[in-house]
Amino acid sequence: MNTMLYPELYRSLEAVRWDMEKDIPWDKFDASLLTDEQAKTIKMNAITEWSALPATEMFLRDNQHDSDFSAFMSVWFFEEQKHSLVLMEYLRRFRPEMVPTEEELHAVRFEFDPAPPLETLMLHFCGEIRLNHWYRCAADWHTEPVIKQIYETISRDEARHGGAYLRYMKKALNNCGDVARAAFAKIGVLMASARRTEKPLHPTNLHVNQALFPRDTVQSRLPDPEWLERWLDEQIRFDGEWEKKVVERILHNLSILFERTFTTAQELNRYRREVTARTNRVADGMVDAI
């Protein structure tokens, strides 16, 4: 039986793919509604999106056992790099002095340490949910119509990517059972507890290469490493209500995935402990049988 998801995901994403020339209303640009401060945040997001390059290299390296998922990376990588490109195209047209240099883009390409593939999958699923909400909030903040449309457009891509990752999580659940449940619940607890952390919990803001610490987050390699917190807290004002939406979306999807209702990170953590204890008992039993 063929259980590959890539062919179907390719068709569904291809059907809604937007055209950078035809679907972005470039002729509606209003220079009076774009400040230098806003243009700088667009530059930072363009560079951040470029980090899909090292993320893809990581995914392909750590998923050599899974050609279906690796093939899907071709679609994900294309669309994420397109996000970087459309933001750079906006700057090229309307703030050319702000276009990232090749050196600035290349700075975010560095090796990520190997990590458990299932945990990484869950981390990026949560990252897509978070980015969808960040971009929707950014679209609300901007009044210039073209960049507003761009953020709305790429936010929908991020939501679709999250949906695709969820399909692979369901497949992993069928193939790996409690091992997958434990991995997804572990990262889910971390991501659903973001309100208690100082820094935004997104893959681009996490340490991923011990040898390069502290310059081992994507954000630490940007021209302004402190921009993200300022963008979220002071500019687009991604407040508690927005954060609540992110957490609710994560818990809602895990409730469906695990067929058990979670309304708080604490409930999910209790489930994580149950599953971990179960997997440990199975592992102990296998050792005893040897």
What name fits each language-model region?
Residues 1-290:
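Non-heme di-metal
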